Structures are given as C-alpha cells and as structure tokens.
C-alpha cells in the first residue's frame, strides 16, 4: 500500500492506494501545533481500522508520498516517517523533487507543492493544455501547457475565507452555512449572502478560466481545447453553477502524489 498525505492550510487529507486505486481516505484538521508523536497516534488510530493494514503503524505500507503547504507540519511528518516508518521509502515534494513536469516560473521554488502535484496529475490523466481549479483555503488556478509544462496560475481568496470576512467585517452580517441558495435573488440576508458566495465564485471561475484559456491557446489556438479540472473540498459548491468545468476529480492531489512517488521509485530499488 502507498500512503499519500496532502497537508493543506485547513485540512490534511490522507489517501491509501493499492496500485492505481485509492481504497481509503481520511480528512483531518491541519494543526501546526501537533507534534510528530501526536500525528503518529492519530494516523495509527485511523489506519489501524483498515482491514488490509496491521495494527502497528507502518504495517502494510510500502511507500509514502507527502506534500504540504504548512512548513511546520511537513517538518513533523518528516519526523514521523523517520521514527515510525523506519525503512519505508518516503517522497516529500519540495524543491528538487523529480516530478516530470517542468516549472516555467520566475522562481520555481515558491510554487506550492500541492499546485505542482495537481499539475502532474492533470498532465497525466487529461493531457494539456489544461487548467486545474482547486477549491481550498485559497482558490487556485494552475495552467498546464500542451507540452505538459507548469506555466503559472492565479491565486484568489477561497470560499470560506470570503464568507468569514463577510461575517467579521459586516456589522449586521453573521456567519452562515455554506450551501447553495434556492434562487439567485435571495429572499433573506442568509440567502443573499449564500447567493453572493456561490454565484460570485462561479462567475469568478468562469471569468478567470476564460482569460487563462485564451492565453494558453495562444494566437490561432482554440480556447475550447483547454481542459478544465476541478478539485478540492469545496468544489461541489460551485460545480453545478460554473459553465467551464469539464471534469471533477476530488482526489487529484493524492493521485498526483502517487505519480510523483512512482517517478522517484527507481532510486529506492
């Protein structure tokens, strides 16, 4: 089994692969205060319930792949792999890790590991040109060229951040449930806020993707040839309202981690 771990700013997602198939997954809160020992106990509690794994941490795991946007958590996970997984090969996606995707940025080291991993998965599963829209703490748009290169992207505030800002900065507004309203024209303050978030973000996605697709296609190219893939925990909120999303792959980042691990596997032989 291959254990993949995607550490985001808000949530950490763990996925278990048997070959190419993801057979189990877990989502926990990301807490920078957790120590390596606390993470190990939490992971053992989750994975110890799986019938294909043993009761000891590391039983049944032949490899580990990790990407993280929170440096302190990455440090602790590195310690987890060293102390609790012994000789199990581990790939941590960071500058210098072999991904197979050229990064055409002014400073490749500043690109988030999760964004690179998403590009790896998109290029492998769908080919290029493609745009990955990841609905997380931030909403990110990442562009993959027809040659499979990572060429850049867009970062905007995420859905939950925007809703929290409304509740904090609006004197007569409050925190509300993140849900699709009955109509665009809200009949209550709650519905009006929900409408602003859901349809506002759908419009943002459609507008940004249209502009990115035109740039990716280039002179004489067809922007409609650009494949648009949605991922991230909040993607379902916008999926039914956006007119540009072609595919939804909730496990895109975990799949990308599997691919990066496989591309680095020969060095473990």
Annotate each predicted stretch with a short phrase.
Residues 1-4, 34, 162-269:
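ATP-binding/phosphotransfer module of carbohydrate and carboxylate kinases, centering on a glycine-rich
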Residues 2-6, 63-65, 130-134, 229:
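Short glycine-aspartate micro-motif
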Residues 2-45, 56-59, 148-175, 180:
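Short glycine-rich, Thr/Ser-proximal phosphate-binding strand/loop in the N-terminal lobe
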Residues 16-18, 77-80, 144-146, 241-243:
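Short amphipathic alpha-helical segments
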Residues 28-34, 95-96, 117, 155-161, ...:
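Short, acidic/turn-prone active-site loops that include or flank metal/cofactor-
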Residues 43-63, 208-225:
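Phosphate/pyrophosphate-binding loops at sites that engage ATP/ADP/AMP, CoA/4′-phosphopantetheine
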Residues 47-55, 61-82, 86:
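Phosphate-bearing ligand-interacting subdomains
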Residues 79, 87-91, 96-169, 198-211, ...:
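Phosphate-binding/catalytic loop of phosphoryl-transfer enzymes
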């Amino acid at each position: 089994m291959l254990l993949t771990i995607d550490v985001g700013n808000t949530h950490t997602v763990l996925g278990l692969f048997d070959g190419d198939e993801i057979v189990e997954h877990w989502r926990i809160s990301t807490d920078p205060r957790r120590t390596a020992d606390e993470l190990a106990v939490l992971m053992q509690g989750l994975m110890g319930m799986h019938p294909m794994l043993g009761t000891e941490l590391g039983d049944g795991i032949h490899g580990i792949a990790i990407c993280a946007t929170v440096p302190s958590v990455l440090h602790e996970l590195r310690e987890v792999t060293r102390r609790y997984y012994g000789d199990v090969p581990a790939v941590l996606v960071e500058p210098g890790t072999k991904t197979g995707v050229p990064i055409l940025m002014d400073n490749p080291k500043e690109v988030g590991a999760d964004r690179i991993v998403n590009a790896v998965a998109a290029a492998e599963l769908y080919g290029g040109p493609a745009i990955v829209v990841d609905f997380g703490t931030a909403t990110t748009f990442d562009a993959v060229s027809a040659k499979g290169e990572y060429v850049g992207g867009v970062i905007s505030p995420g859905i939950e951040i925007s809703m929290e800002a409304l509740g904090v900065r609006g004197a007569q507004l409050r925190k509300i449930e993140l849900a699709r309203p009955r109509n665009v024209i809200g009949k209550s303050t709650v519905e009006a806020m929900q409408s602003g978030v859901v349809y506002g973000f759908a419009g943002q996605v459609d507008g940004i993707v249209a502009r990115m697709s035109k740039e990716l296609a280039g002179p004489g190219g067809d922007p409609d040839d650009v494949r648009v893939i949605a991922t991230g925990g909040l993607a379902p909120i916008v999926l039914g309202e956006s007119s540009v999303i072609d595919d939804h792959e909730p496990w895109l980042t975990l799949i990308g981690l599997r691919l990066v691990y496989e591309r680095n596997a020969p060095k473990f032989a």
